Amino acid sequence: MMTEISVPLIFTDAAANKVKALISEEENPNLKLRVYITGGGCSGFQYGFTFDEKVNDGDLTIEKSGVHLVIDPMSLQYLIGGTVDYTEGLEGSRFVVNNPNASTTCGCGSSFSI
């Protein structure tokens, strides 16, 4: 019997599939999507996404569909219980974070406050 391990952040199929497509375009299977939090934006904190080849000590790695999402420990504390997704809409296509810890978010959804 397999046991379900609680993952502190959900990495959706849509996000994983887009990461897989982008990695394929770059022809570098070592790339991982890193999500991080920085100070700034209109609400105090903002989300960032970048591709990274390395995993640092203390980073959390979530695997889905053969690709990896990496989060540093400082950012993770603000993201616990959230969802990393990929959307296509009027604002264009982008990775987004749905964060239940955010008390307010800006209109574009890229910054938040606790």
Curated annotation (Swiss-Prot):
**Cofactor binding, per record:** Binds 1 iron-sulfur cluster per subunit.
* UniProt KW Iron keyword: yes
Membrane-crossing residue ranges in chain numbering = none
Which portions of this protein are annotated as coiled-coil regions?
Answer: none
Q: Which GO terms describe its cellular component?
A: cytosol
Q: Which residues bind iron-sulfur cluster?
A: C42, C106, C108
Keyword annotations for this protein, in alphabetical order, are: Iron, Iron-sulfur, Metal-binding
- Spell out the molecular function terms from Gene Ontology: 2 iron, 2 sulfur cluster binding; 4 iron, 4 sulfur cluster binding; iron ion binding
Protein family according to the UniProt entry? Belongs to the HesB/IscA family.
Per UniProt, subunit arrangement is: Homodimer.
Give the function comment from the record.
Answer: Required for insertion of 4Fe-4S clusters for at least IspG.
NCBIfam families assigned to the protein according to its UniProt record, in alphabetical order: iron-sulfur cluster assembly accessory protein, PRK13623.1
The protein in question is named Iron-sulfur cluster insertion protein ErpA
Native source organism of the sequence: Pasteurella multocida (strain Pm70)
Task: Tell me the gene name.
Answer: erpA
